[in-house]
């Protein structure tokens, strides 16, 4: 009884502390509803400039759009393959030598900390401008993400079947491929498809730093204020995301066993995937490094390992610590605001609560929200709030709404409604069912999704300075362009520590709740 009361007290204190942190983050960013009410129409006016889109420009969008899809597929495939091999070294239950596991985990976490836009900028220094740099950046980012996800999935597996097969005389490799790989692969491939969907959106903004794809065209048209053509680019990007997501949904259903599998279907799907991958490799042709590129790699490594300690601990609003605090505040406030709207949208987005046709329309709306690149949202909200972290909060909110609504909807779609239906038959009201049935049964999945999104948003918020939306992104890009790698190292080290602390916080919250 005492332990139960103690846990309840810990949960209440944790909840109060989290509420205080959230309120503090909103205050740091200067969030003001009055500004949104008075100047919200400016965002609407900006969006109106994009519509109706310039349909005559469609023909010039197709080629860079195809290049964007190629970059995403090739980068995801390469990163996922290397990530699978790294996952075996990442997992604690496979590698008995702790120093190997520690080194691998540190490298993976360091790379995972770096936003893909920053990876793309580094890649352009080494391999030059173009789609090859973007593909390599996506591959490296995917490798780090999938190595971590795969390693954690392996740790959750039981190795008893593997041990049993080796005990009866089977070779270790054969036993491993017939037990661990068979159990791991469906979930790993499904996660790879989620990453592919995200990479399509990442690839759409890499052109901002000259890393190829439709982002080059989008950045150009925004700079020239040809907003009707910007609208056409976004429409075409939405169509591409819709097609990719449709294919991804089919493949996930196939992997999960919801669609009947057979040998013929396996062969056809495998051949199609390989054909798409080989075709996508044309995006990375003529990859070569110059002597300057090799020097840049050396300078980057030297700068990161020899950071500017004075700059790292400098006080004032131009110091790393304050800018990182602002970045964290943007990420926390944006994630929380996005989560609130995502819950509301989930209720009108799931077939379990509303008719299927209405849910389909809702999902299209959410997909459209997810399609818009992050810096386009930044430009829209700067018209409302002016430059600064307030615009960053609204930008992170919109980015969070799209992805959290999808994660929440997946959780609801997989939710057994036995208790919900029983309470409904007993005459319990809708609000009461939400409070006493839905919330207790779904809160863990929702909380995990929010913490994952917060982790992503901290890295994403570190690039918002590109469009004047606050955070540490502006000095990070400036120092990279000026080859101040010691200052870049200072920023990345602090960013790494912050991401690591968020991960530890997430694990602690799982234990408490």
Where in this protein do the model-derived segments appear?
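Hydrophobic alpha-helical transmembrane segments of polytopic membrane proteins
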Residues: 214-251, 472-508
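Generic hydrophobic transmembrane alpha-helix motif, especially the helices
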Residues: 108-142, 366-397
């Amino acid at each position: 009884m005492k332990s139960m009361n103690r846990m309840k007290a810990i949960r209440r204190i944790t909840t109060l502390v989290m509420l205080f942190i959230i309120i503090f983050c909103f205050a740091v960013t200067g969030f003001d509803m009055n500004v949104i009410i008075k100047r919200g129409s400016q965002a609407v006016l900006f969006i109106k400039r994009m519509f109706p889109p310039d349909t005559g420009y469609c023909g010039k969008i197709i080629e860079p759009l195809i290049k964007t899809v190629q970059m995403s597929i090739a980068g995801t495939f390469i990163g996922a393959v290397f990530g699978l091999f790294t996952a075996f070294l990442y997992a604690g239950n496979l590698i008995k030598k702790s120093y190997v596991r520690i080194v691998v985990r540190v490298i993976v976490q360091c790379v995972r900390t770096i936003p893909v836009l920053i990876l793309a900028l580094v890649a352009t220094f080494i391999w030059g401008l173009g789609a090859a740099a973007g593909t390599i950046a996506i591959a490296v980012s995917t490798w780090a993400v999938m190595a971590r996800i795969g390693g954690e999935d392996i740790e959750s597996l039981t190795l008893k079947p593997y041990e049993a097969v080796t005990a009866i005389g089977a070779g270790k490799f054969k036993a491993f491929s017939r037990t661990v790989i068979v159990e791991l692969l469906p979930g790993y491939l499904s996660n790879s498809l989620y990453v592919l969907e995200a990479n399509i959106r990442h690839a759409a903004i890499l052109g901002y730093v000259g890393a190829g794809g439709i982002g080059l065209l989008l950045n150009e048209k925004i700079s020239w204020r040809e907003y009707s053509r910007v609208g056409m680019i976004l429409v075409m990007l939405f169509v591409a995301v819709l097609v990719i997501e449709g294919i991804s949904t089919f493949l996930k259903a196939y992997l999960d066993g919801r669609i009947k599998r057979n040998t013929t279907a396996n062969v056809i799907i495998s051949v199609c995937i390989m054909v798409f991958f080989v075709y996508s490799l044309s995006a990375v042709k003529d990859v070569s490094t110059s002597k300057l590129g090799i020097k840049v790699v050396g300078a980057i490594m030297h700068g990161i390992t020899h950071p500017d300690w004075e700059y790292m601990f400098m006080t004032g609003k131009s110091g790393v610590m304050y800018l990182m605090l602002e970045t964290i505040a943007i990420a926390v406030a944006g994630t929380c605001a996005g989560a609130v709207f995502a819950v509301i949208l989930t209720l009108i987005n799931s077939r379990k609560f509303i008719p299927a046709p209405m849910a389909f329309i809702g999902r299209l709306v959410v997909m459209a929200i997810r399609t818009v690149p992050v810096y386009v949202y930044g430009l829209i909200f700067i018209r409302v709030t002016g430059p600064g972290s307030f615009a960053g909060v609204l930008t992170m909110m919109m980015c969070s709404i799209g992805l959290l609504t999808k994660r929440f909807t997946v959780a609801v779609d997989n939710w057994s409604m036995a208790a919900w239906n029983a309470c409904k038959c007993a005459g319990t009201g809708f609000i009461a069912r939400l409070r006493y049935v839905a919330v207790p049964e779904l809160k863990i999945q929702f909380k995990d999704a929010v913490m994952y999104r917060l982790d992503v948003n901290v890295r994403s918020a570190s690039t918002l300075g590109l469009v004047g939306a606050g955070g540490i992104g502006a000095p990070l890009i400036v120092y990279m362009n000026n080859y101040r790698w010691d200052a870049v190292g200072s920023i990345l080290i602090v960013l790494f520590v912050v991401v690591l602390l968020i991960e530890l916080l997430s694990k602690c919250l799982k234990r408490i709740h």
